């Protein structure tokens, strides 16, 4: 007789394979068509709120794998909080202004067409370009299963948003922190605009290294009691800045020496200068820095005076100890020049070429031929003009600032720019902005903790923030200047009127409306007396003000300020984290975030940066089409994301294997609880059930603890270990007999099913933030006992496994199971046995702490465990120094359950006879 029909074999329609690339898009479409985000809000109304403030990606081009890592990580964290019962908010955003978009539009137009085009028309084209990529990227993010307020994103070029960026600027101005200065800043001659520190990249560049003699004036020599040749030797890597030299900085605490051949260098650098062949003479006289202070040397290029000044910035780790100082071309030069009244000479135009001032100020001999010449092409002619004053010249490669967009080397160039002053105190505050920002950092939690040690020193050491740009596509610094006095108008009525016009017409109003139209009705100002400031804001100001425009404005249902979390790549320590911190500290004196998480960058399998030229780019769209977004999401969760991440086809295939393990574990659990109508009471669980429930409780608490601290790698490693070892490796294996062969409603079967149902549901709540699609699919196939009133995954709230006391200490049992497995391994290989049910174990029964005989037999998946056996001994193993012997089972194989517990092979065992007979 075939007893298969009498077995309760697992049943489920939940498919073994997910067919994710085909099925996910349909499910995601349903979610977004029914606005699942709004449903999530409604389901958690009144609950504790978790706010994740989304840092805006740039609306230019398709998303790359780094974008996918970032948004998936945010989605996992948001959903983790949601499934823990919290209300959540994430309003996605896009950065839409700035140079990269201008460049793309310029490329399409051509330079001459762009220059002939009115600013308003050019801005219109930039707006259209950005709008197109907002739509493209939104769809790409949605294809990753990311749930956010996609219907109401923040877009920095929206009219109201531009108005609020401008209002943030006005708030900074009202607090006295907005200043206009003529000072050197990073200048991109290729893009013709100022840059902020966050827009600077460092690349290797070959430059000249030159040593130049500046002869002392006759009056200086007389004061020092010197005759004959005597001059200071400077070192520089930028010969093109020498025409703008107006000073030489020396260290106030150092001694200087005059050599026999007439050169003055720092005593601490003298030996190095001899070694390098810069000077040759004996050090014949020592001179204190204070003796040189205020004396004049002569610039050998143009005979203009160069004043010797004291500067703390002069170091002794290189050069001569005498620093060429051109206040128009360097931050330190400018500071020391300001302190000592040095003239700021700046003969370079926005294209990086010498302008007419080289002629007007006699900065170079035969200056006319230098007008219009690019400064980098002027190095060689200048070296020739130095003649004998050029003591040594060589070339070397060093790390040099480059423009983030054009990739061209930058220069320092003194121009009129707008700055947020870091070392001034906002009105009403007793702290400078720097102090307020540094103090605010101490209130923030950082993951990883080392992230704090990156942000804090950056803020402690940063210069004033240059927020003006000489471009067209951005929010204008929309202030009026009085033509006659150059005074800037900060009249509150005027500022708010301009902001209200931006609300209605966008920042384009600054370009399309006349001054008269931009002034409020009945204004006391005469439009004829005023001019518009033409600069626009740095895009880092746009994104740095999003806490104000999104979280505080009331225009979005975006959550709380300060936000619970900001999460971006580690490059944002000098970007968004910092710009947001400075503006929030300037206006409110607090950080805009409670927690910062940083992640690394995505690399190929060899750990190399991805680039189209290398052909190693992994596009999210390709991954989703090949593997499904769930695999990409699991890759993120299984990544040590705080460091750089490797991704490749092989890595994704390994991730897909882990996904299959999780999926098939749930499939087995679903299939085995399909006929369970009610959970058993707590006292009905057997020893094995209590063991797995206790183990699951500990493991899930540990997983939850890891997830709470955003350590998804550790959490998933803990969960995977449990699934592989205790759950699938032991419990799901050892309980098959009771699930398939016991009577349908037997206590032991229902208890195990109940344990499986509880574990499944708790485990579902832990995987749902990552594998949301799969969790939803599991629920669709789950029996009523499992899902109750749940319609979809977004109805789910994590439920921990009930606390269950362990029924036994499993240490000895796990060791015994492993030793038994090792002992019989050869029996299987040599085909002495086909299955462990053919065996029985004999030994000290009391050493094995499971009291129920059947549970103990199931633990080893054998037909008997007893004190002694008369069956043929085939193996043995030792536990705690005691020997257990393994024997062929004495009884016959039951044709139904295959346990060797029957009197003959034709007869059912006692248990099966009862079940079938009933």
UniProtKB/Swiss-Prot annotation:
Q: So where does ATP get bound?
A: 612
Which terms in the Gene Ontology molecular function aspect does this entry carry?
Answer: aminoacyl-tRNA deacylase activity; ATP binding; isoleucine-tRNA ligase activity; tRNA binding; zinc ion binding
The free-text cofactor remark is: Binds 1 zinc ion per subunit.
Q: Where is this motif: 'KMSKS' region?
A: 609-613
The record ties this protein, via Pfam families, to: Anticodon_1 (PF08264), tRNA-synt_1 (PF00133)
Question: Where do the annotations place Zn(2+) binding?
Answer: 894, 897, 909, 912
Keyword DNA repair belongs to the record: no
The UniProt subunit note reads as follows:
Monomer.
Instruction: Specify the protein name.
Output: Isoleucine--tRNA ligase
Report the gene name.
Answer: ileS
